[in-house]
């Protein structure tokens, strides 16, 4: 967990695809 959100192997938040994630991270959590 990072900042209370689960993250994927890239360290991107995967809970709700929050604003501020880069395009790659958004694709990861769709």
From Swiss-Prot:
This is Babycurus-toxin 1. Has the structural arrangement of an alpha-helix connected to antiparallel beta-sheets by disulfide bonds (CS-alpha/beta). It comes from Babycurus centrurimorphus. One of its GO terms (cellular component) is extracellular region. Residues 2-30 form the LCN-type CS-alpha/beta domain. Pfam families: Toxin_3 (PF00537). GO terms for molecular function: sodium channel inhibitor activity; toxin activity. Its main location: secreted. Belongs to the long (4 C-C) scorpion toxin superfamily. Sodium channel inhibitor family. Keywords: Ion channel impairing toxin, Neurotoxin, Secreted, Toxin, Voltage-gated sodium channel impairing toxin. Expressed by the venom gland. Binds to sodium channels (Nav) and inhibits both the activation and inactivation of the activated channels, thereby blocking neuronal transmission. It is found in: Secreted.
């Amino acid at each position: 967990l990072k900042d209370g959100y689960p993250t994927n192997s890239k360290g991107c938040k995967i809970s709700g695809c929050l604003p501020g994630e880069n395009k790659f991270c958004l694709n990861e959590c769709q």
